[in-house]
Regions:
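N-terminal flexible segment immediately upstream of the FAD-binding catalytic core
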Residues: 1-63, 79-110, 160
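Residue-level detector of anion-binding/catalytic polar loops
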Residues: 70-71, 133
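Short, ordered loop/turn segments at secondary-structure junctions
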Residues: 76-79, 139
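FAD-binding subdomain of flavoenzyme oxidoreductases
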Residues: 101-108, 112-190
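Aromatic/hydrophobic pocket-lining residues that form π-stacking "cages" and hydrophobic walls in ligand
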Residues: 61, 68, 123
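A generic structural-conservation signal
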Residues: 24-25, 74, 136
């Protein structure tokens, strides 16, 4: 444990310089972020929780954690019933709740661009006056980032498909901090 302690302290120090008060090691916040909605998994809190506001900040966080071999756990709103939010090896929980902007809606093309922290209900509220809606309903008010991470589906999947069929592209931060963009606005037609 002593060998892990110094790199973790260094990583948390660098993250604190980057994010200031958007990094917390509060016991209550850590416990909340180490426990999903399913009682099957033992809650395991991270060492710290960070709250990025942009893809670039996520990239910087991931780069710092990777350089110090610090485990990372992404967090939307904690609706996971599969143990995805537990931190069995400690590390940093990356809470995406402050990345909750609907960037644009293209009504004519029936698509939109959102940040990972946008929830299903938030998006549908935003779309309400357009006559459009986001059909994936996993039964919880999950974030779209969390839904993408778990390949969500739900009660409307038979008619509208799963999340897989409703995503045209993603902006992804790789484990080394590199940012890539997948897909595009064109739908596959053959």
């Amino acid at each position: 444990m002593a060998t892990q302690s110094l790199p973790r302290e260094n990583a948390i120090g660098e993250l604190s310089q980057l994010l200031g008060d958007r990094l917390t090691a509060s016991v209550a916040v850590r416990e909340q972020h180490g426990n999903g909605e399913c009682g099957l998994y033992t809650p395991q809190p991270p060492d710290a929780v960070v709250f990025p506001r942009s893809t670039e900040e996520v990239s910087a966080i991931v780069s710092i954690c990777a350089a110090h071999a610090m485990p990372m756990v992404p967090y939307g709103v904690g609706t996971s019933v599969e143990g995805n939010v537990t931190a069995p090896y400690g590390g940093v929980c990356i809470d995406l709740s402050q990345m909750n902007e609907v960037v644009c809606v293209n009504e004519a093309d029936l698509d939109c661009t959102v940040q990972a922290g946008v929830t299903r209900k938030q998006l549908n509220q935003y779309l309400k006056d357009t006559g459009l809606f986001f059909p994936i309903d996993p039964g919880a008010d999950a974030t779209l980032g969390g839904m993408a991470a778990t390949r969500a589906s739900g009660t409307n999947a038979v008619r509208y498909g799963t999340l897989r069929e409703n995503v045209l592209g993603l902006t992804v931060v790789l484990p080394d901090g590199k940012i890539i963009k997948t897909g595009g606005r064109a739908r596959k037609s053959s």
